[in-house]
Amino acid sequence: MVGVTLANVLPVCLALLPPPAAGLYYLAELIEEYTVATSRIIKYMIWFSTAVLIGLYVFERFPTYMIGVGLFTNLVYFGLLQTFPFIMLTSPNFILSCGLVVVNHYLAFQFFAEEYYPFSEVLAYFTFCLWIIPFAFFVSLSAGENVLPSTMQPGDDVVSNYFTKGKRGKRLGILVVFSFIKEAILPSRQKIY
């Protein structure tokens, strides 16, 4: 009998971890570079998710409360999209969207525990109605930090931000996490003369 040990599992985990991390890093770079196109793509994803939810209600008779919460969540996502790529983590829309993601998951788990559907259909529901839009917003959290100043808010210029908010050189978000991981795993060598 062959036992599964940490020595067997660890190399597999280490081999499977870098490709998704590299893909997410590249995706974060693309989102930072093309914020207008990303906003448009997220808007189409929200419309697609809304159409899927309406179709599930009309053709599959999914519960009204589950579809209603999903549609309200998409409405909140449209509110987040109004200030994209500048997403404030303390804004009511962002906090409400995080809470609604949890509520949507609870309702979906409760529904699929009572009703049998094949795994592929359950996975499709979770992917297109619950995961894809929050994932898109999550990956694009760092996109607002590298956009040039605009006229979105009066008095929000570079000089007043520097003096009122302190250091603006700090970068936050998923891109910083991936940059740290990249430097920790594959440190760059500097030539010393």
Curated annotation (Swiss-Prot):
UniProt subcellular location: Membrane
Listed GO CC annotations: COPII-coated ER to Golgi transport vesicle; endoplasmic reticulum membrane; Golgi membrane
Alphabetized InterPro entries for the sequence: Svp26/Tex261
One of the record's GO molecular function terms: COPII receptor activity
Any Pfam family hit: Erv26
GO BP of this protein: endoplasmic reticulum to Golgi vesicle-mediated transport
Membrane topology reported for the UniProt record: Multi-pass membrane protein
Keyword annotations of the record: Membrane, Transmembrane, Transmembrane helix
Regions that span the bilayer: 1-21, 39-59, 67-87, 94-114, 122-142
Family membership: Belongs to the SVP26 family.
PANTHER family linked to this entry: PROTEIN TEX261, TEX261 PROTEIN
Protein name in the entry: Protein TEX261
Gene source species: Bos taurus
Gene encoding the protein: TEX261
